[in-house]
Amino acid sequence: MGGKELSEEQVASMREAFSLFDTDGDGRIAPSELGVLMRSLGGNPTQAQLRDIAAQEKLTAPFDFPRFLDLMRAHLRPEPFDRPLRDAFRVLDKDASGTVSVADLRHVLTSIGEKLEPHEFDEWIREVDVAPDGTIRYDDFIRRIVAK
């Protein structure tokens, strides 16, 4: 079956999740549990996607862990790891314009949570285009940060 290789860590997480959902301990899980199981592992399949997977994979009976790994290799689409970053920017983007004020961003990143030093922020901000009104497009900022 095509798809991506899974790391030992991913397989261990999947084994743990699988065993939690295998409530009767028979080593098998009902097809109806697949969506919850995938979501517990960072996937975010829609009901339509789950129906497609079930049809494509002919999932009509409970399946075991090796079959589950095959399904995950083929179908697990993890949430983009930059989503929390995008969500944080959206909070600062009060008018939903796709831009944030450099001053607001500086304040948040140098004073909340794992604080950046002001000189670290200055290094980051030098890598993006700041508009004349003092804002940046956060998609550009995220793209540059994620690329590093």
UniProtKB/Swiss-Prot annotation:
TM helices/strands, residue ranges: none
One Pfam family per UniProt: EF-hand_6
Binding residues annotated for Ca(2+) 2, in chain numbering: D93, D95, S97, T99, D104
One GO CC term on file: cytoplasm
Keywords, ordered alphabetically: Calcium, Metal-binding, Repeat
Protein role: Potential calcium sensor.
Designated name of the protein: Probable calcium-binding protein CML7
Organism of origin: Oryza sativa subsp. japonica (Rice)
Taxon lineage: Eukaryota, Viridiplantae, Streptophyta, Embryophyta, Tracheophyta
Encoding gene (name): CML7
